[in-house]
């Protein structure tokens, strides 16, 4: 039997096949892994890669393109890389690194990529944001005029921090730098300020301790913890602050206020140095790469107070008439008090002031161990509440005169009455500035203590009784003059009427002798 080939039938069949053919083509540049050393991968053949682009490796692993050379690309791998080997394919993604942002992250602990590590389930984020963003321009910024109360007498009275400011916390190891930052976070409870705590290169146990303390004091619900612990790769430690900053910018650009702590930027600089040296970039001073200043300046310049037009534009008109701010408290660890080292001088020059913590003061039991002479706030004075500004000036002056006279008094045997009084006043004010950890004070409580010091109510109290006197006075004010404290905390105003009320209350308390 002979088969008859029907040309019409065959052409119809071919036509249907052609019509049903779906050509889903995806143009992606692919390259080959040439070498892999210490988390740094060299790739050949990625012609169209951008700087900072995400590169996809087998096993759902990603890297960050950092060196674009003539015939190869140097990238850092974000995460474990044991399963990657020479000859593997690497693909361009056409995307830059983004992290989840939004309210859903509050109360959670995430890694540098925004992935939850607290066992609390996945995060349903409202949006994602690139970790690298251009800082707000000069025109979109607004001057710092509202305070961020840390709850610490010595900071709020002498080195005040404003919303949108960058205030450096600098000191040797074990001087209470993290304690100051954690107290500041705890004090934001109920103020509406969202907090981001970025832990860089710390022990996982230390981060767990911080999270536990925040939880105990009810401060975790308004805080995001971004942790890149010491066990994680240098690449993740290097990008963690940028990820935290992107999360803070979400609130800033919606007309809200946020506070970010970088703990600490010394370790970020070390991680960046490690990555740069492995990428064979030329080393400079202290073996840091040439752009280590830019590493910190582009991060800290993103902390700012932005005007209402900027917020309105970014929210597409949903939020009107509200300014937003991102306040930064970067931490730098010094070696043997050397603030003239490379990284400390860099960050001091970028920030709007510094809180200098000293080992000698810490060991002498003066905690927080703030050196009032070296600590300064360049823009915070404009943001201080009226009452703290009025009362804090006297305290700063007392301490400055005390430091000067104390050095002189070591050599002088007979001191005149005025000098002796000044020394005694200084000792009492120094004692008054001591504060227990995790016990931040309200503006009203602070005003009472500062008023007592300024008006000479402490002059007849023994130096070793000052702390007892203060806690008894605060207890008395809370129970008998709670309304006055609330009024001062709410308004922050200072008038002759308030001064008279405070004077009468403290005089009345002193007659009881209950301390």
Curated annotation (Swiss-Prot):
Give me the reactions it catalyses.
Answer: ATP + H2O + 4 H(+)(in) = ADP + phosphate + 5 H(+)(out)
* Annotated site location: Required for activity: 375
Query: At which positions is ATP bound?
Result: 171-178
EC numbers for this chain? 7.1.2.2
Superkingdom to which the source organism belongs: Bacteria
Give the matching SUPFAM superfamilies: C-terminal domain of alpha and beta subunits of F1 ATP synthase, N-terminal domain of alpha and beta subunits of F1 ATP synthase, P-loop containing nucleoside triphosphate hydrolases
Q: What Pfam families does its record include?
A: ATP-synt_ab, ATP-synt_ab_C, ATP-synt_ab_N
Q: Which family does it belong to?
A: Belongs to the ATPase alpha/beta chains family.
Kindly give the PANTHER family that the UniProt entry links to this protein.
ATP SYNTHASE SUBUNIT ALPHA, MITOCHONDRIAL
Subunit relationships: F-type ATPases have 2 components, CF(1) - the catalytic core - and CF(0) - the membrane proton channel. CF(1) has five subunits: alpha(3), beta(3), gamma(1), delta(1), epsilon(1). CF(0) has three main subunits: a(1), b(2) and c(9-12). The alpha and beta chains form an alternating ring which encloses part of the gamma chain. CF(1) is attached to CF(0) by a central stalk formed by the gamma and epsilon chains, while a peripheral stalk is formed by the delta and b chains.
Q: Please report the name of this protein according to its UniProt entry.
A: ATP synthase subunit alpha
Natural source organism:
Nitrosococcus oceani (strain ATCC 19707 / BCRC 17464 / JCM 30415 / NCIMB 11848 / C-107)
């Amino acid at each position: 039997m002979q088969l008859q080939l029907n040309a019409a039938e065959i052409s119809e069949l071919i036509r249907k096949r052609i019509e049903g053919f779906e050509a889903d083509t995806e143009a992606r540049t692919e390259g080959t892994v040439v070498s892999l050393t210490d988390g740094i991968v060299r790739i050949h053949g990625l012609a169209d890669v951008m700087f900072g682009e995400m590169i996809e490796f087998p096993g759902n692993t990603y890297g960050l393109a950092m060196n674009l050379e003539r015939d190869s690309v140097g990238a850092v791998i974000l995460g474990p890389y044991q399963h990657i080997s020479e000859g593997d394919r690497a693909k361009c993604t056409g995307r830059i690194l983004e992290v989840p942002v939004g309210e859903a992250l509050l109360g959670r602990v995430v890694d540098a990529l925004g992935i939850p590590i607290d066992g609390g389930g996945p995060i349903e984020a409202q949006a994602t944001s690139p970790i690298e963003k251009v800082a707000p321009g000069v025109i979109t910024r607004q001057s710092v005029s509202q305070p961020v109360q840390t709850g610490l007498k010595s900071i709020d009275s002498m080195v005040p921090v404003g919303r949108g400011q960058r205030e450096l916390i600098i000191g040797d190891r074990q001087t209470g730098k993290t304690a100051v930052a954690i107290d500041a976070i705890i004090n934001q409870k109920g103020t509406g300020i969202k907090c981001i705590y970025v832990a860089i290169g710390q022990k996982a146990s230390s981060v767990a301790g911080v999270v536990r303390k925040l939880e105990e004091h009810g401060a975790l619900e308004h805080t995001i913890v971004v942790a890149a612990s010491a066990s994680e790769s240098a690449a993740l430690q290097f990008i963690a602050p940028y990820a935290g900053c992107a999360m803070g910018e979400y609130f800033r650009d919606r007309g809200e206020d946020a506070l970010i702590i970088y703990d600490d930027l010394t370790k970020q600089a070390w991680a960046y140095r490690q990555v740069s040296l492995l990428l064979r970039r030329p080393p400079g001073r202290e073996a840091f790469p040439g752009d280590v200043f830019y590493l910190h300046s582009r991060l800290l310049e993103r902390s700012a107070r932005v005007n209402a037009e900027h917020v309105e534009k970014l929210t597409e008109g949903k939020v009107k008439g509200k300014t937003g701010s991102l306040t930064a408290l970067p931490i730098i660890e010094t070696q043997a008090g050397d603030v003239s080292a490379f990284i400390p001088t860099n960050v001091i020059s970028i920030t709007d002031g510094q809180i200098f913590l000293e080992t000698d003061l810490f060991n002498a039991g003066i905690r927080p161990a703030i050196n009032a002479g070296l600590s300064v706030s360049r823009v915070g004075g404009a943001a201080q509440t009226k009452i703290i500004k009025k009362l804090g000036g006297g305290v700063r002056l007392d301490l400055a005169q005390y430091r000067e006279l104390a050095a002189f008094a070591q050599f002088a045997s007979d001191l005149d009455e005025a000098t002796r009084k000044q020394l005694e006043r200084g000792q009492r004010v120094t004692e008054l500035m001591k504060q227990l950890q995790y016990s931040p004070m309200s503006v009203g409580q602070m005003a009472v203590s500062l008023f007592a010091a300024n008006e000479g109510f402490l002059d007849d109290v023994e130096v070793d009784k000052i702390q007892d006197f203060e806690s008894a006075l605060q207890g008395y004010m809370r129970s008998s003059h709670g309304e006055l404290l609330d009024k001062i905390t709410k308004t922050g105003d200072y008038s002759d009427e308030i001064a008279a009320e405070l004077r009468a209350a403290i005089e009345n308390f002193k007659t009881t002798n209950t301390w």
